[in-house]
Regions:
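Acidic, Ser/Thr/Pro-enriched low-complexity segments and adjacent helix/loop capping patches
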Residues: 1-176
């Protein structure tokens, strides 16, 4: 089920909430001029968020916060490069006992939050959602509803606020 809409017809927050509530899997692309933001969702949770304007990677965030050393980051990256099956860095760091799942989840959350904050500042643009397979590579699942609550949704319309309230009442999705 592809969705293509201008921001005038469907706000990014509204699309995220609909995709979250309906537990959709696929890719959201938001474009404004030459700027592009990409989000990947699996069962309604964000597993990937990227923007050329926000380049801070997970390992760098964890080093900056003092959660891991540069040496241990490199150790995990080296191991990741040797794996035959893809696996996200956060999972490798946890498996090596270098950091807790909670610390990685918190860092991934802040990484995705920065991308969503940027998207919510756009006043115009086009949204495109395409259903697609998203392999489970051990990614951390971030609930878009939780992100919108943390960011604050005072400026959003009544439909979005109602959807957020509804989404907060549903059972939580399992996280990796």
């Amino acid at each position: 089920m592809p969705i293509i809409a201008d921001f005038d017809d469907l706000a990014p927050a509204e699309l995220l909430l609909v995709l979250s509530l309906s537990r959709k899997t696929g890719r959201v692309t938001a474009v404004r001029g030459d700027q592009k933001i990409v989000l990947t969702l699996r069962n309604g949770s964000i597993v990937y968020a990227a923007s050329p304007a926000i380049r801070e990677r997970l390992g760098d965030i964890l080093v900056k916060r003092g959660a891991i050393s540069e040496h241990n980051l490199q150790r995990a990256l080296d191991r990741q490069g040797l794996l035959l099956e893809p696996k996200v860095l956060g999972t490798i760091l946890v498996e090596l006992g270098l950091v807790s799942t909670a610390v990685v989840h918190q860092a991934v959350f802040s990484q995705f939050e920065a991308v969503i904050r940027q998207l919510l500042t756009w006043d115009r643009g086009e949204l495109n959602f395409q259903s697609s397979e998203v392999p489970d590579v051990g990614a951390y699942l971030i609930d878009p509803v939780e992100l919108l609550v943390v960011i604050g949704y005072d400026g959003l319309g009544p439909l979005v606020k109602g959807l957020v309230r509804l989404a907060l009442k549903r059972p939580a999705a399992k996280t990796a």
